[in-house]
Amino acid sequence: MISSCTTRKMAEQEQRKIPLVPENLLKKRKAYQALKATQAKQALLAKKEQKKGKGLRFKRLESFLHDSWRQKRDKVRLRRLEVKPHALELPDKHSLAFVVRIERIDGVSLLVQRTIARLRLKKIFSGVFVKVTPQNLKMLRIVEPYVTWGFPNLKSVRELILKRGQAKVKNKTIPLTDNTVIEEHLGKFGVICLEDLIHEIAFPGKHFQEISWFLCPFHLSVARHATKNRVGFLKEMGTPGYRGERINQLIRQLN
């Protein structure tokens, strides 16, 4: 009885034994793994070199001439603004402006670059809401050849925020889909939901700056043919500068 049990156990152990892999197959598998590791390393190095190469951009002589011309033009224009400001009068019925950057700023003066940065328009075809004040109007005059701006209505404000509204929370960009996030960051200003946020932007109050800075700049949609036919696309958009209430048409076009 004992011998039969022992025999059965030995048979089961033999069945459970892991089958041995032939030595030549192990060598092939090891060589294949080494080859894959080498290929992965080479691909990583090539990717790093490609990233390094992207930083090296050679400028043509025409680009330097164009940048020099832009800087001279900016200097003359800004000097004229200092001598004869011709500031726009503050409108009685409008307290909110929407500014869209529609031109590249390569080679422009440092003052223009700094003003663009203050307006948070670092990317082309991005837009921000700005409260209409003498100081902000002066900033808009400085960057006038590179942006277009006007007075949005409540419908445009609502559509922009509902479709493209985003906020930066803990260095992460998140869509405005949760009222809890809005209440957590803007509740101290009496803003607890998306409708409150839209109202505070459309009708600027004393906390407009804090609320508008909670919003990320709006990255507007550009037609597919814009990259191929930039001149034609800019003609469709219109010229830079002030356009009053016609900014609502542009918002609907790019939203």
From Swiss-Prot:
User: Where are the Phosphoserine residues found in this chain?
Assistant: S63
Q: Which UniProt keywords apply?
A: Phosphoprotein, Ribonucleoprotein, Ribosomal protein
- Single GO molecular function: structural constituent of ribosome
PROSITE patterns the record matches: RIBOSOMAL_L30 (PS00634)
What's any GO biological process attached to this entry? Answer: maturation of LSU-rRNA from tricistronic rRNA transcript (SSU-rRNA, 5.8S rRNA, LSU-rRNA)
At the top level, the lineage of the source is Eukaryota
Q: Name one GO cellular component term.
A: mitochondrion
UniProt key word Ribosomal protein: yes
In the UniProt record, the signal sequence range is none
* Protein family membership: Belongs to the universal ribosomal protein uL30 family.
UniProt xrefs under PANTHER family: 60S RIBOSOMAL PROTEIN L7, RIBOSOMAL PROTEIN UL30-LIKE
Q: Which NCBIfam families match?
A: uL30_euk
Supply the name of the protein: Ribosomal protein uL30-like
Which species is this UniProt entry from? Homo sapiens (Human)
Per the record, the gene is RPL7L1
